[in-house]
From Swiss-Prot:
Glycans are attached at residues 216, 240, 245, 256, 267, 303, 328, 365, 386, 419, 431, 578, 626, 734, 866, 917, 926, 989, 1046, 1057, 1076, 1201, 1209, 1253, 1262. Involved in the initial immune cell clustering during inflammatory response and may regulate chemotactic activity of chemokines. May play a role in melanocortin signaling pathways that regulate energy homeostasis and hair color. Low-affinity receptor for agouti. Has a critical role in normal myelination in the central nervous system. The chain crosses the membrane at residues 1283-1303. This is Attractin. It comes from Rattus norvegicus (Rat). SUPFAM superfamilies: C-type lectin-like, EGF/Laminin, Kelch motif, Spermadhesin, CUB domain. One of its GO terms (biological process) is response to oxidative stress. Residues 135-251 form the CUB domain. Residues 1066-1111, 1112-1160 form the Laminin EGF-like domain. Residues 87-1282 are extracellular. Residues 24-86 form a propeptide. Disulfide bonds join 104-114, 108-121, 123-132, 135-161, 253-263, 257-274, 276-285, 819-921, 1066-1074, 1068-1080, 1083-1092, 1095-1109, 1112-1121, 1114-1128, 1130-1140, 1143-1158. Heavily glycosylated. One of its GO terms (cellular component) is plasma membrane.
Length: 1432
């Protein structure tokens, strides 16, 4: 019973379609055993919605076996008929085979079956994977209801799946997305209202679509009206999620009536519709109607005929007329419209009077497109406009700015071509017409995803400021572009302050009180291969052109909107997906609502709209009118057309100071003590505003971690977080710099024009090349600063020039000559950078100690040509703009220009011959800029786009090449259905696919099979109904030609067959007839394979779909080649090339394989070893060698051996070219099946002297891989040359003798030197020994005996006693008198005395010595003192 229960459980697990080892998506456990409401059956597939009957579940339980055992036993004892006996034998055999069969490790799902031979699942058409758990093909669904799913678990990488739901023509079908989780902006599910991708697109789902509530009203739902629906899913190779579970039904009310009504059949048609509950209206009962009876009779009245319900009395507003006028709290409302021309995204809107003008935008289908829309904010109705408003081509991602009843539209992406434009057009509201402006100075970037504002500067100029955006040629733009409305000119502003990073899809607002722009978020690239969303907030002051970094929001997003209400910037919606390798739950579409307090630099999160409807979106527009924000359109997988209205809290609704101060968040109110009124931020006085700022400053909390984010001095000191710069890093102001570092706390003190700071802000090669101080590093795809010493010591790189200021006192001509000595010339200060640098350097030099006593008025390269014309040394005219003449200048006496005091920025005219202090020299920078590759946007073919590197991506259906860091910015609404990189390009159209399987992998293709019954056909653009004819011309203007059904391209009457869901069973590629509908009878035309899809050995080509095979072209050096490419597998080592037409010259092989072969050149007297053991060597069966004798009077010996048998042929020729080209080789040796061979070739027999270029050829062939071969040629003499011997012998002997003499002499010198050193050390040692004097008494015979002391009469004593080590022995020295002559006089020449020494034993005499010493002490008083002496 336990086993049976386990079997039943395993069967049930297979029916569920997943096992416990398979990761189930979020939410499965809650739904996995939910009973089916309609049938009471069990639901084993939660995502699929499949219900199994109760009968089936009972059948899966094991039957009772005990009552049947006796019956079974009796049946076994009965004799079996022959047929039954044979069946039993067959069953036994099959049982034995089943015992040997392999079982699949995991159960097969989705209709797959386990193959007992391989132990692997065999999947039905459309399913792939080890368990058939992933979709991977096309499906056709015909039921009146059903489900669409990618399979259990996470979907597969690089997946393409297509579902065709076929119903009845023009019958309404509803698709309900119960679960959907894919990678945002990269993995899409497209829904078409028809039977092909050429039908109208109605949705492009991506990201995490999770209902905001548990109710049914927020789950996405798509309505299809044609009776057909095509769903196509594509995923890339980044990361995958749990996929989707979609149910469809032809008889279902919208959103199941949102749970607030009943679904009933319509009386007038066969459709169904909702009968809403009380207080609910709308097609799906999702609109509140007359809540709280509109507060009747005090606040309003219910209008049953109006979908809006309440008609509020004066002084009341909001849902149910529950909020007074002015509003004491904020609230949301929603207006829904069904006009097909309204849905759009990435449009722009402005308000003029009571009219909201909406211009441009992206739409799925352009049949009902209107370029300009007008919305009456008072009546909440859309207005009708003239058809002339559509005279401009469709675009999106542009900018709008309003000025005096004129709407200025700039940039954007042209939808029909995919190009980004730099057009500036003006829409005149009064006559509803467009005018194209042609600026005088065209120095602007073509951008998309930017913003623009028209402002009046303090100088009175009216300009349009274009902020950031993405340019396909220059990447993400970080500059501010200015258009002067009066001068009709463009310019790029040189801003100051923080170095900000521009991006795509940010929001920006202009605050009239602070005269500043506030820019938030966006999609940004921080290098060519690093990009992400941003949460930055920047402030740009329009008069000072100063950027300041404010507190970031910590909410990353792009394609959101912002407006300013009473000193508060309100931010709504956007795309918040910021995951790159795995999902962290960030959603594509957001309804986040945030507020930024301008005065306090503080963010707060506001409640999301509570509208009983999903309002998540991005790419919408937002405008402000009478403190009310209007949000229109956007994208949330579907294009939206509703209007969200947010009415903010009003300051004047608060009557007390406490309530006024506590107002918000979302509004900033100030209490006016004089009038005792609560006023908004815009109406506050300067004193009130400053007081508020000071209060906020005292309460603010600093985020010290933000300081670490700044990598340059400018951004570190131009922010609101109190940071300061310490040499090379930014730290909080309460952290001191370390010793030796300089602290910079103010922006003005930062070193200006440091290229290390701003080069890394450039994200493309072209933008990097615009600045001569930067260079592009192609390996790391980043912009880096040029080295500081590129100009040399003392020179400074400024732009593309090197400048140097000297202090020498000289006249103009000498200064010019001094510059020329450095290959320079006097500077032409024609750019702002040069002027600023020179003036700054002069100020620094003037303040330094070394030059403080000098008054520097340096010469510059400015001269007077005639009476009224001055020009620079580079011949450019002087314009008196960057530098200006001082008052009363130029004087008539001067013809040369000098700089006056640096603070004045002025010029003076001086006499050219007068010597003055200083000169400014200039020379070109001596570096060459690296050439940039062709920008991705200018590459028009896939091969060109993806060939060089991974920096570009090719979108196949859009036929566009984009930067890899701009894919999301280029296709924000899923326009790209499939992309390619790194040399992987598809055919340009369907006709390029040669097999049906490859054809049906493309969602827009179908297969037309010819009548030959061989599987031959053609791939054509088409739908389920048949082929379609593509338009012959591209879209022009706002006219988009659509493909039309053309069945004549595949006529069924002519026995052609159109396949759109599955391929025909016969797939023999036109090389064989099919038997049993699918088996190729005999592959002909040199083909082989299950479907005759490859060429036979020795032939190559593409035999698919009737293709031909041709012989391998290998020039006789190979018999096999790659069956697809034709690349030959050369059999001779040293021969290479696609057709074996080249020799490996780089490896010492030479020859001509077109007329002969290749040979390895051997050196004489060297042994060579060739090991052919690599996988690339498996086709080699031959190798050839060539050798030429070095000596003409010696024989040539050779030997060769190998690890395997081989054939050997040796020939010779009079020269190498003769042997390879004319065939004049003479055979010498021919051996077969040998392993070793030796031979000698006589110089006399082969006449080496008369054939100086004689060459021997060795042909080794017929061996097998792997093999090791050794070969050598050598020349040795038979008789030794005696003369040479003796010459060599004596030369060696004399050389050795000379070496020995030199060594002996060196040794003697070393010995003598060492001996001298030793003697010197001995003398020093002897001189350092202790010494003393001794008295000697010489007795003579005439001396009276009494004159000699008694002590001398004792035993003679030694003059020295030198103890040895251990005091056992000593050296005793005494005076000895030598024999004397007559008179006691020694002989002449002699002293008569000698010193005698002897080694004596003192071990036994030491006590006596000590005794004598003690006796001497006792006798000191008895005897007079005497000198120590010795008696001889």
């Amino acid at each position: 019973m336990v086993a049976a229960a386990a079997a039943a459980e395993a069967t049930e697990a297979r029916l569920r379609g997943y096992t416990t080892a398979t990761a189930a998506p979020a939410g499965w456990k809650e739904r996995q055993h939910r009973p089916c409401a309609a049938t009471g059956a069990w639901r084993p597939w939660p995502r699929a919605g499949l219900c199994l009957p109760r009968v089936l579940s009972r059948a899966l339980s094991p039957p009772p076996l005990l009552p049947l055992l006796p019956l079974l036993f009796s049946l076994l004892l009965l004799p079996l008929p022959r047929e039954a006996e044979a069946a039993a034998v067959a069953a036994a055999v099959s049982g034995s085979a089943a015992a040997e069969a392999k079982e699949c490790d995991r159960p097969c799902v989705n209709g797959g079956r386990c193959n007992p031979g391989t132990g692997q699942c065999v999947c039905p058409t459309g399913w792939v994977g080890e368990q058939c758990q992933h979709c991977g093909g096309r499906f056709r669904l015909t039921g009146s209801s059903g489900f669409v799913t990618d399979g259990p678990g996470n979907y597969k990488y690089k997946t393409k799946c297509t579902w065709l739901i076929e119903g009845q023509p023009n019958k309404i079908m509803r698709l309900r997305f119960n679960h959907f989780a894919t990678e945002c902006s990269w993995d899409h599910l497209y829904v078409y209202d028809g039977d092909s991708i050429y039908a109208p697109l109605i949705a492009a789902f991506s990201g995490l679509i999770v209902p905001e509530r548990d109710g049914n009203e927020t789950a996405p739902e798509v309505t299809v009206t044609s009776g057909y629906a095509l769903l196509h899913f594509f995923s890339d190779a980044a990361y995958n999620l749990t996929g989707f579970n979609i149910t469809y039904n032809f008889d279902m009310c919208p959103n199941n009536c949102s749970g607030r009504g009943e679904c009933k059949s319509s009386n007038s048609s066969s459709t169904v519709e909702c009968e809403c509950s009380e207080n609910w209206k709308g097609e799906s009962c999702d609109i509140p109607h007359c809540t709280d009876n509109c507060g009747f009779p005090h606040r309003g009245i219910c209008n049953a005929s109006d979908t809006r319900g309440c008609s509020c009395f004066p002084h009341w507003q909001g849902p149910g007329c529950s909020i007074p006028v002015p509003a004491n709290q904020s609230f949301w409302t929603r207006e829904e419209y069904s006009d097909l021309k309204l849905p759009r995204a990435s449009h722009k809107a402005v308000v003029n009077g009571n009219i909201m003008w909406v211009v441009g935008g992206y739409m799925f289908n352009h049949s009902d497109y209107s370029m300009v829309l007008a919305y009456d904010l008072a009546s909440r109705e859309w207005l009708s406009l003239n058809h002339s408003v559509n005279s401009v081509v469709v675009r999106y991602g542009h900018s709008l700015a309003l000025h005096k009843d004129k709407i200025y539209m700039y940039g954007g992406k042209i939808d029909s071509t995919g190009n980004v434009t730099n057009e500036l057009r003006v829409f005149h509201i009064h006559n509803e017409s467009w005018v194209l402006l042609t600026p005088k100075a065209k120095d602007q970037y073509a951008v998309v995803g930017h913003s623009a504002h028209i402002v009046t500067l303090s100088s009175g100029r009216v300009v349009m400021l274009v902020i950031f955006g993405h340019c396909p040629l220059y990447g993400y733009i970080s500059v501010v572009q200015e258009y002067d409305l009066e001068k009709n000119t463009w310019s790029i502003l040189q801003t100051q302050g923080a170095l900000v990073q521009g991006g795509y899809g940010h929001s920006s607002v202009y605050d009239h009180r602070t005269k500043a722009l506030y820019v938030h978020g966006g999609y940004k690239a921080f290098s060519a291969n690093k990009y992400r969303l941003a949460d930055d907030l920047y402030r740009y002051h329009v008069d000072t052109q100063m950027w300041t970094i404010l507190k970031d929001s910590r909410f990353f997003r792009y394609l959101h909107t912002a407006v300013i209400v009473s000193g508060t910037m309100l931010v709504f919606g956007g795309n918040t997906h910021n995951d790159t390798s795995m999902s962290h739950g960030a959603k594509c579409f957001s309804s986040d609502f945030m507020a930024y307090d301008i005065a306090c630099d503080r963010w707060s999160v506001l409640p999301r709209p509570e509208l009983h409807h999903d309002v998540n979106r991005f790419g919408h527009s937002a405008v402000l009118h009478n403190s009310t924000m209007y949000v229109f359109g956007g994208f949330n997988s579907l294009l939206l057309s509703d209007v969200l209205v947010f009415t903010s809290e009003q300051c004047d609704a608060h009557r007390s100071e406490a309530a006024c101060v506590a107002a918000g968040p979302g509004i900033r109110c100030l209490w006016d003590t004089q009038s005792s009124r609560c006023t908004s931020w815009e109406l506050a006085t300067e004193e009130q505003a400053e007081k508020l700022k000071s209060e906020c400053f005292s309460k603010r909390t600093l985020d010290h971690d933000r300081c670490d984010q700044h990598t340059d001095c400018y951004s570190c000191t131009a922010n609101t977080n109190d940071c300061h710069w310490c040499n090379d890093h930014c730290v909080p102001v309460n952290h001191s710099c370390t010793e030796g570092q300089i602290s910079i706390a103010k922006y003005d003190n930062c070193p200006k024009d440091n290229p290390m700071y701003y080069c890394n802000k450039k994200t493309s090669c072209r933008s990097c090349a615009l600045d001569q101080n930067c260079q592009w590093e192609p390996r790391n795809q980043e912009c880096i600063a040029l080295p500081e010493n590129i100009c040399g010591i003392g020179w400074h790189l400024v732009g593309n020039s090197c400048l140097k200021i000297t202090t020498a006192k000289e006249n103009y001509d000498n200064a010019k000559l001094s510059c020329r000595n450095h290959n320079a010339f006097l500077a032409s200060l024609t750019s702002q950078k040069k002027v600023e640098f020179v003036l700054k350097q002069l100020r620094l030099m003037q303040s330094s100690q070394s030059t403080s006593k000098l008054t520097l008025t340096p010469w510059v390269g400015l001269r007077k040509i005639n009476v009224s014309y001055w020009c620079w040394e580079d011949m450019s005219p002087f314009t008196n703009s960057l530098l200006q003449w001082m008052p009363s200048e130029p004087s008539d006496a001067g013809f040369c220009g000098i700089l006056s005091e640096p603070s004045t920025r002025g010029l003076k005219a001086a006499t050219c011959i007068n010597p003055l202090n200083g000169s400014v020299c200039e020379r070109p920078a001596n570096h060459s800029a690296k050439q940039c590759r062709t920008p991705c946007a200018l590459r028009t073919a896939c091969g060109e786009c993806t060939s060089s590197s991974s920096e570009c991506m090719w979108c196949s259906n859009m036929k566009q090449c984009v930067d890899s860091n701009a894919y999301v910015a280029s296709f924000p609404f899923g326009q790209c259905m499939e992309w390619y990189t790194m040399s992987s390009c598809p055919p340009e159209n369907c006709s390029g696919y040669c097999t049906c399987s490859h054809c049906l992998e493309q969602p827009g293709c179908g297969w037309c099979t010819d009548p030959s019954n061989t599987g031959k056909g053609k791939c054509i653009e088409g739908s389920y109904k048949g082929p379609v004819k593509m338009p012959s011309h591209a879209s022009t203007g706002n006219v988009y030609p659509q493909p039309l059904l053309n069945s004549s391209m595949c006529l069924e009457d002519s026995r052609y067959n159109w396949s759109f869901i599955h391929c025909p069973a016969c797939q023999c590629n036109g090389h064989s007839k099919c038997i049993n509908q699918s088996i190729c009878e005999k592959c002909e035309d040199l083909t082989t394979g299950k479907h005759c899809e490859t060429c036979i050995s020795g032939f190559y080509g593409d035999p698919t779909n009737g293709g031909k095979c041709q012989p391998c072209k290998c020039n006789g050096h190979a018999s096999l080649c790659n069956t697809n490419t034709g690349k030959c597998f050369c059999t001779t080592k040293g021969v290479k090339g696609e057709e074996c037409q080249l020799c490996e010259v780089e490896n010492r092989y030479q020859g001509n394989p077109l007329k002969g072969t290749c040979y390895y050149t051997l050196l004489i007297d060297y042994q060579f070893t060739f090991s052919l053991s690599q996988e690339d060597d498996r086709y080699y069966t031959a190798i050839n060698f060539v050798a030429t004798p070095d000596e003409q009077n010696r024989d040539l010996d050779m030997f060769i051996n190998a690890s395997k048998n081989f054939n050997l042929n040796i020939t010779w020729a009079t020269s190498f070219p003769a042997g390879t080209q004319t065939g004049e080789e003479v055979p010498v040796v021919s051996k077969t099946n040998i392993k070793e061979y030796k031979d000698s070739f006589s110089n006399e027999k082969f006449d080496f002297r008369n054939h100086p270029n004689i060459t021997f050829f060795v042909y080794v062939s017929n061996f097998t891989w792997p093999i090791k071969i050794q070969i050598a040629f050598s020349q040795h003499s038979n008789f030794m040359d005696l003369v040479q011997f003796f010459v060599t012998f004596f030369s060696c002997f004399l050389s050795l003798l000379l070496v020995a003499a030199v060594v002996w002499k060196i040794k003697q010198s070393c010995w003598a030197s060492r001996r001298r050193e030793q003697l010197l050390r001995e003398m020093q040692q002897m001189a350092s020994r202790p010494f003393a004097s001794v008295n000697v008494a010489l007795e003579t015979d005439e001396e009276p005996p009494d004159l000699i002391g008694g002590s001398i009469k004792t035993v003679p004593k030694p003059i020295a006693l030198e103890p040895c080590f251990g005091n056992k022995a000593a050296v005793l020295s005494v005076f000895v008198r030598l024999p004397r002559g007559l008179g006691g006089i020694p002989p002449p020449g002699q002293s008569g005395l000698a010193v005698a020494s002897a080694l004596v034993d003192i071990s036994q005499q030491m006590p006596i010595v000590y005794k004598e010493k003690s006796g001497a002490v006792r006798n000191r008083k008895q005897q007079p003192p005497a000198q120590p002496g010795t008696c001889i």
